[in-house]
Curated annotation (Swiss-Prot):
Family annotation (Gene3D superfamilies): Porin MspA (Ig-like beta-sandwich domain) (2.60.40.1650), Porin MspA ribbon domain (2.10.300.10)
Highest taxon in the source lineage: Bacteria
Phenotype of the disrupted gene, per the record: Single deletion is viable. A triple mspA-mspC-mspD deletion grows slower than the single mspA or double mspA-mspC deletions and has reduced Fe(3+) transport compared to wild-type.
Lineage summary: Bacteria, Bacillati, Actinomycetota, Actinomycetes, Mycobacteriales
Pfam families xrefs: MspA
Coiled coil: none
InterPro entries: Leukocidin/porin_MspA_sf (IPR036435), Porin_fam_mycobact-type (IPR015286)
Name of the encoding gene: mspD
GO biological process terms on file: monoatomic ion transport
Cell compartments where the protein resides: Cell outer membrane; Secreted, Cell wall
Function comment: A backup porin induced when MspA, the major porin, is deleted. It probably forms a water-filled channel which favors the permeation of cations. There are about 2400 porins in wild-type, 800 in an mspA deletion and 150 in a double mspA-mspC deletion.
Name of the featured protein: Porin MspD
Family: Belongs to the mycobacterial porin (TC 1.B.24) family.
Subunit structure: Octamers. Probably forms a goblet with the wide end on the exterior of the outer membrane and a central channel. It is not known if mixed oligomers of MspD with other Msp subunits form in vivo.
């Protein structure tokens, strides 16, 4: 039985690399939550560099991802805001040679700017060095045929009225997909009250 497999591994550098101008906002979205606060989430400096797969398999797609997610909260109690900032992808493929998708990733190298990571194993508010082993595994039954799968590659707990998370050269692969693969990056801000806002970028073609 073959599977559509998606895997992320992260390099040790935290230097953000992007061909676009620094702080160039790619997309953003705002929403007013139940407490009257305006929640805004942005993606900036997004770059997905598709490369020839090392396994030389025609069903494999490989890429490196750099970018930044930023959030802002305005309104009453903005400084007391608590929530989660997520980055991830919507993955689209015309055909899969199997019945499932498996996903795993290694905790990414990230730089927190103006935010705070409060949950273990982090406990820091500056630079995080990743674990050497995958931290999350996700499986889903897709069956044969076209499909779209949304996967949050990582998330951090944040506090305060604003903050940003940068990721450099996240390594991703998709195997078992016949035809091209489209990746639509997203950033999502989820308040502790349950309110959320998600911004989606333009699809990147990993042919």
């Amino acid at each position: 039985m073959r599977y559509l497999v998606m895997m992320f591994a992260l390099l040790v550098s935290v230097t953000l690399v992007s061909p676009r101008p620094a702080n160039a906002v790619d997309n953003q979205l705002s929403v007013v939550d139940g407490q009257g606060r305006t929640l805004t989430v942005q993606q900036a400096e997004t770059f997905l560099n598709g490369v020839f797969p090392l396994d030389r398999n025609r069903l494999t797609r490989e890429w490196f991802h750099s970018g930044r997610a930023t959030y802002h909260v305005a309104g009453p109690g903005a400084d007391e805001f608590e929530g989660t900032l997520e980055l991830g992808y919507q993955v689209g493929f015309p055909w899969s040679l199997g019945v499932g998708i498996n996903f795993s990733y290694t905790t990414p190298n990230i730089l927190i700017d103006g935010g705070d990571i409060t949950q273990p194993p982090f406990g820091l508010d500056t630079i995080i060095t990743p674990n050497l082993f995958p931290g999350v595994s996700i499986s889903a039954d897709l069956g044969n045929g076209p499909g779209i799968q949304e996967v949050a590659t990582f998330s951090v707990d944040v506090k305060g009225a604003k903050g940003a998370v940068a990721v450099s050269n996240a390594h991703g692969t998709v195997t078992g997909a016949a035809g091209g693969v489209l990746l639509r990056p997203f950033a999502r801000l989820i308040a502790s009250t349950g309110d959320s806002v998600t911004t989606y970028g333009e699809p990147w073609n990993m042919n």
